[in-house]
Swiss-Prot record:
It comes from Microcystis aeruginosa (strain NIES-843 / IAM M-2473). SUPFAM superfamilies: Photosystem II reaction center protein L, PsbL. The gene is psbL. GO terms for cellular component: photosystem II reaction center; plasma membrane-derived thylakoid membrane. This is Photosystem II reaction center protein L. HAMAP family: PSII_PsbL. It is a single-pass membrane protein. PSII is composed of 1 copy each of membrane proteins PsbA, PsbB, PsbC, PsbD, PsbE, PsbF, PsbH, PsbI, PsbJ, PsbK, PsbL, PsbM, PsbT, PsbX, PsbY, PsbZ, Psb30/Ycf12, peripheral proteins PsbO, CyanoQ (PsbQ), PsbU, PsbV and a large number of cofactors. It forms dimeric complexes. Keywords: Membrane, Photosynthesis, Photosystem II, Reaction center, Thylakoid, Transmembrane, Transmembrane helix.
């Protein structure tokens, strides 16, 4: 039972990191586009 959670934990961590990176990238793009349009 100790062997199965290890790959699952790694997959969850990879999914979380990719999700956070995607949100950060979207936020940066939103700030850039908002500043571009408002200026």
């Amino acid at each position: 039972m100790e062997r199965t959670p290890n790959p699952n934990r790694q997959a969850v961590e990879l999914n979380r990191t990719s999700l956070y990176l995607g949100l950060l990238l979207v936020a940066v793009l939103g700030i850039l586009f908002s500043s571009y349009f408002f200026n």
